[in-house]
């Protein structure tokens, strides 16, 4: 059977589907890049917030419409199914199979035979091969979450925090290096908590050391670091040659009152100290964060505190989102809901400030050299990234030329608000 795989949602889904494709191939199937060549479609969904749910449902419905009059099967898997499986099966009976949060091998084994939506999510797995395109790959080191952020529903459909064994992760990374993958991106709900459940201590520093010891020309990026777990040992582990000094630390807000309502344990003064410590360790550290605006109870004063926080820290990269009022989240019962139009205005105001910070930082890069990895070519322009940018969520470096694999030194010739332009420095 020819399978076309559509991946929605976060990079953890990308990692899961890379393994799913490998298991499907081992069972005698083919993975196709064109929908017109497919006998079956697998849609891996996201069920985190309202916008993600809408996108997933719209995609499912579009494939259901597409398959009319065709000999095409549509299968749906992932977080949306784990969270709303019963309702989905009732509302969209045209789907040929539903699978919740399961190891990819389980999905490949049961697809076309029966639905599998486990009572207890099973988000981690053992490595047995994967299929990737491009020069970067996401590697899931753990999944699930034991925290209780009031706005978050992830523990409901991903379950408790579970780490993979370190040797299994290294086996997967060695597999990727052998296949010339140049950027290994470690993902989890909280990468800094890696190992606490199975080794009874934080193992991210040890994991980074052992990855760094592997031979090959590649670099390592760490995503989703919860500020509560960031120790000096973790910060020091970013000194390894192959580990990028890129710190993705979602703080969610800059008001102590709102942080308390979010059930986040760190106060802003502690967050300031953390970011100051990282920059004292590494003058070239890139700080990335995420901010939620419009949280219940957020007043103009609270929002101004967040703006002050952003202006003072001057994050290199920042993503901001409007609060999504999820019925199963404890924040759903909070009073003081912020009207959508006010939240949208605050989001725009915040991003205006961040764009100024970003442009000022980018201007300072003009004339300097950056090591760049190219992801694709479009109309004679190479689209790449330096150590400062993760795929899809951050900025790009644009260079005229034909696609090249590997790392290249690029001299920056001009700067935009977020993106850079440059030219390859010939040796």
UniProtKB/Swiss-Prot annotation:
Broad enzyme group: transferase
A GO BP annotation: tRNA modification
GO cellular component: cytosol
KW Kinase (keyword) present: no
Cofactor: [4Fe-4S] cluster
SMART domains, per database record: Elp3
Cofactor descriptive note: Binds 2 [4Fe-4S] clusters. One cluster is coordinated with 3 cysteines and an exchangeable S-adenosyl-L-methionine.
Pfam name, any one: Radical_SAM
Binding site for [4Fe-4S] cluster 2: 145, 149, 152
Residues annotated to bind [4Fe-4S] cluster 1: 10, 46, 79
Subcellular location, record wording: Cytoplasm
Keyword 4Fe-4S appears in the UniProt entry: yes
Keywords, alphabetical: 4Fe-4S, Cytoplasm, Iron, Iron-sulfur, Metal-binding, S-adenosyl-L-methionine, Transferase
Coiled coil: none
CDD domains the UniProt entry points to: Radical_SAM (cd01335)
EC number(s) per entry: 2.8.4.4
All copies of domain TRAM, residue ranges: 363-426
Xref: HAMAP family: MTTase_RimO
Record family assignment: Belongs to the methylthiotransferase family. RimO subfamily.
PANTHER family cross-referenced by the UniProt entry: RIBOSOMAL PROTEIN S12 METHYLTHIOTRANSFERASE RIMO, RIBOSOMAL PROTEIN US12 METHYLTHIOTRANSFERASE RIMO
Protein's job: Catalyzes the methylthiolation of an aspartic acid residue of ribosomal protein uS12.
Listed name of the protein: Ribosomal protein uS12 methylthiotransferase RimO
Source organism of the structure: Thermosipho melanesiensis (strain DSM 12029 / CIP 104789 / BI429)
Organism lineage: Bacteria, Thermotogati, Thermotogota, Thermotogae, Thermotogales
Originating gene: rimO
């Amino acid at each position: 059977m020819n399978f076309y795989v559509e991946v929605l949602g976060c990079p953890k889904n990308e990692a899961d589907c890379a393994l799913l494709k490998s298991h499907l191939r081992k069972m005698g199937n083919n993975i196709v890049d064109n929908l017109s060549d497919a006998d079956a479609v697998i849609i891996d969904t996201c069920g985190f917030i309202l916008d993600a749910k809408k996108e997933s449902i719209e995609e499912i419905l579009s494939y259901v419409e597409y398959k009319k009059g065709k000999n095409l099967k549509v299968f749906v898997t992932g977080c949306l199914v784990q969270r709303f499986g019963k309702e989905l099966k009732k509302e969209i009976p045209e789907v040929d199979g539903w699978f919740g949060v399961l190891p990819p091998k389980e999905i490949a084994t049961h697809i076309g035979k029966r639905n599998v939506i486990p009572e207890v999510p099973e988000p981690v797995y053992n490595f047995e091969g994967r299929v990737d395109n491009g020069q970067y790959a996401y590697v899931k080191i753990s999944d699930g979450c034991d925290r209780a952020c009031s706005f978050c529903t992830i523990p409901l459909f991903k379950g408790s925090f579970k780490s993979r064994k370190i040797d299994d992760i290294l086996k997967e990374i060695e597999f990727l290096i052998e296949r010339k993958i140049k950027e290994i991106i470690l993902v989890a709900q909280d990468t800094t908590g890696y190992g606490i459940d199975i080794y009874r201590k934080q193992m991210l520093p040890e994991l980074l050391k052992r990855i760094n010891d592997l031979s090959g020309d590649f670099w390592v990026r760490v995503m989703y670091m919860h500020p509560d777990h960031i120790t000096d040992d973790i910060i020091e582990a970013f000194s390894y040659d192959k580990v990028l000094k890129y710190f993705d630390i979602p703080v969610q807000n800059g008001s102590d009152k709102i942080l308390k309502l979010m059930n986040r344990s760190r106060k802003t003064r502690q967050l300031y100290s953390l970011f100051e410590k990282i920059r004292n360790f590494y003058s070239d550290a890139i700080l990335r964060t995420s901010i939620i605006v419009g949280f219940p109870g957020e007043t103009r004063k609270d929002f101004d505190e967040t703006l002050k926080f952003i202006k003072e820290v001057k994050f290199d990269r920042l993503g901001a989102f409007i609060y999504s009022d999820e019925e199963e989240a404890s924040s759903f019962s909070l009073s003081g809901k912020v009207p959508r139009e006010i939240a949208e205005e605050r989001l725009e105001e915040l991003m205006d400030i961040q764009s100024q910070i970003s442009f000022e930082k980018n201007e300072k890069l003009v004339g300097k050299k950056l090591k760049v990895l190219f992801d694709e070519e479009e109309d004679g322009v190479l689209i790449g990234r330096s150590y400062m940018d993760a795929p899809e969520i951050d900025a790009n470096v644009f260079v005229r030329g034909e696609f090249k694999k590997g790392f290249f030194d690029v001299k920056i010739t001009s700067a935009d608000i977020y993106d850079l332009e440059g030219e390859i420095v010939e040796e």
